[in-house]
UniProtKB/Swiss-Prot annotation:
Source organism per UniProt: Plasmodium falciparum (isolate 3D7)
Keywords of the record: GTP-binding, Ligase, Manganese, Metal-binding, Nucleotide-binding, tRNA processing
Protein name: RNA-splicing ligase RtcB homolog
General function of this protein: Catalytic subunit of the tRNA-splicing ligase complex that acts by directly joining spliced tRNA halves to mature-sized tRNAs by incorporating the precursor-derived splice junction phosphate into the mature tRNA as a canonical 3',5'-phosphodiester. May act as an RNA ligase with broad substrate specificity, and may function toward other RNAs.
Miscellaneous section: Ligation probably proceeds through 3 nucleotidyl transfer steps, with 2',3'-cyclic phosphate termini being hydrolyzed to 3'-P termini in a step that precedes 3'-P activation with GMP. In the first nucleotidyl transfer step, RTCB reacts with GTP to form a covalent RTCB-histidine-GMP intermediate with release of PPi; in the second step, the GMP moiety is transferred to the RNA 3'-P; in the third step, the 5'-OH from the opposite RNA strand attacks the activated 3'-P to form a 3',5'-phosphodiester bond and release GMP.
Record: residues binding Mn(2+) 2: C123, H260, H354
Enzyme Commission number, as recorded: 6.5.1.8
Pfam families: RtcB (PF01139)
Entry similarity comment: Belongs to the RtcB family.
GO biological process: tRNA splicing, via endonucleolytic cleavage and ligation
GN (gene name): RTCB
Length: 506
């Protein structure tokens, strides 16, 4: 590991005049091309300071705090403006989770890095509205929760309900949600309110390894484990009535379904394959990275293009996953309430990605530049009238879906112009872990967590009991602080808040 700072890390971090914005000055690590920008309030900064203090007690540890990772990313070839950390930031593989970094497509040395996307490619969130209210589901809450748990395949080894062969899988990996529409799992209008219309145009299944396909072929339409979930939620607060109305949300206690899932084993294998290829190719392109977890290759190289094509395929797989679970959720609600999903107004409000790299146009130094924007644990936040925002939301900006934890709030935000200027049109993605999974298991009580959920009248079904502690609210930062930090900084606007009444986990 190179680049251990000679002076205390805090010496390189300074508060700016802008609300909730700190800067990491050049010099924290060698050869920083740009500054680091961190969006945190005082409370969240304390968590980062604690992470730094732990690291400085043992600098020979393999653990790197998020602040160091943000600085390390700033050394990568072709990066522009800043390496950006959002308030839910925490240490990850190479790039921290909650990091945004953009690379100039016109710079032949500019890179793409799988660590800047993550292993769960296109891990993301979908929100489905209904015309039901809490009083409609309360008498049937346990029955509905159990039926959803029975319908949606969950857990590490779960297998999907979609019977898929190699030919079908290749077709699906190339078409994304268009495949779901063709097969009858999605409504046509679903894809219109989905980031990129639910289809990555980079995708080419020929660049997905046989091993990755074998892992994916049985997992299509599954939730998975870890922090993935399906929740029945109710609207708790409405902050922006006009924007909420455009999304079909008009009253408190309206029932929604939130699905958080990704590309499962297929995406993980694609990331693993790419990291191996890039570690081998860095010598060829004379790239030296400060941390081997930042393995990368020039965007326009053969290896870079191969990764983008495979990554696009994983993105499509993830959109199919969320689409097929939408199909199952609609079936479950239809069965319990004896009405069609259409009669229940079970329309997709939006579907966003939290782990992705995409070619976008942004202003840099007054000029429009084509950039490869890496968002890892962050959400696109485009403003009103942006051409990539769906027609339904042209007047309010892109909906931004922020998942909380199984005992706390989730949020819907909207994008704005400040984000385009400050963060490449990006904002936070969730609460962000505060405790490691091991620490959660060792310090939290299974029964205590269950009792707290019961006190809040939250129904829960979980395939693996250890996940109760790992995913407990105490394991995460306060999502309200995270969202408010972004709102106060002006990089996203609060629209409405949801609270869970039923949680299904792997």
């Amino acid at each position: 590991m190179k680049g251990i700072p000679k002076r205390p890390i805090s010496n390189y971090i300074e508060k700016t005049n802008e609300t909730n914005l700190y800067k990491i000055r050049k010099g924290l690590v060698n050869e920083m091309n740009v500054e680091g920008h961190i969006y945190v309030n005082e409370k969240l900064k304390t968590l980062l300071d604690e992470e730094i203090a732990t690291y400085e007690l043992n600098k020979n540890s393999t653990f790197l705090p998020a602040v160091m990772q943000i600085a390390n990313v700033s050394t990568l070839p072709g990066i522009v403006k800043a390496s950006i950390a959002l308030p839910d930031v925490h240490a990850g593989y190479g790039f921290s989770i909650g990091n945004v970094a953009a690379f100039d497509m016109d710079n032949e040395k500019a890179i793409v890095s799988p660590g800047g996307v993550g292993f769960d490619i296109n891990c993301g969130v979908r929100l489905i509205r209904t015309n039901l209210f809490y009083e409609d589901i309360k008498p049937k809450q346990e029955e509905l929760t159990q039926l959803l748990f029975n319908h949606i395949p969950v857990g590490v080894g779960s297998q999907g309900f979609i019977l898929c062969n190699q030919e079908n899988l290749d077709d699906a990996l190339c078409l994304g949600m268009d495949w779901c529409v063709k097969e009858g799992y999605s409504w046509i209008e679903d894809k219109l309110n989905c980031e990129d219309n639910g289809r990555s145009l980079y995708a080419d299944s020929n660049f997905v390894s046989i091993r990755a396909k074998k892992r994916g072929i049985t997992q299509m339409g599954t939730l998975g484990a870890g922090n993935h979930y399906a929740e029945i939620q109710i609207v708790d607060q409405i902050y922006d009535k006009k924007s909420a109305k455009l999304m079909g949300i008009e009253k408190k206690n309206q029932v929604c379904i939130m699905i958080h899932s990704g590309s499962r084993g297929l995406g993980h294998q694609i990331a693993t394959d790419a990291l191996i290829d890039m570690e081998k190719s860095m010598n060829k392109y004379k790239i030296n990275v400060i941390d081997k977890q930042l393995a990368c290759t020039p965007i326009h190289s053969k290896e870079g293009q191969n990764y983008l094509k495979a990554m696009g395929s994983a993105c499509n797989f993830a959109w199919i996953n969320r689409s097929s679970m939408t199909f199952l959720a609609r079936q479950a609600f239809s069965k319990i309430f004896n009405q069609s999903p259409d009669d229940l107004d079970m329309h997709v409000i939006y579907d966003v990605s939290h782990n992705i790299a995409k070619i976008e146009e942004h202003y840099i130094d007054g000029k429009i530049k084509k950039l490869l924007v890496h968002r890892k644990g962050s959400t696109r936040a485009f403003p009103p009238f942006h051409p990539l925002v769906p027609l339904d939301y042209q007047y309010c900006g892109q909906p931004i879906l922020i998942g909380g934890t199984m005992g706390t709030y989730s949020y819907v935000l909207t994008g704005n112009e400040k984000a385009m200027q400050a963060t490449f049109g990006s904002t936070c993605h969730g609460a962000g872990r505060a405790l490691s999974r091991n620490k959660s298991r060792n310090t939290l009580s299974y029964l205590d967590v269950l009792n707290k959920l019961k006190e809040q009248n939250i129904s829960i079904r979980v395939a693996s009991p250890k996940l109760i502690m790992e995913e407990a609210p105490e394991s995460y930062k306060n999502v309200c602080d995270v969202v408010q930090t972004c709102h106060d900084a002006g990089i996203s606007n609060k629209c409405f808040r949801l609270k869970p009444v039923a949680v299904i986990k792997g």
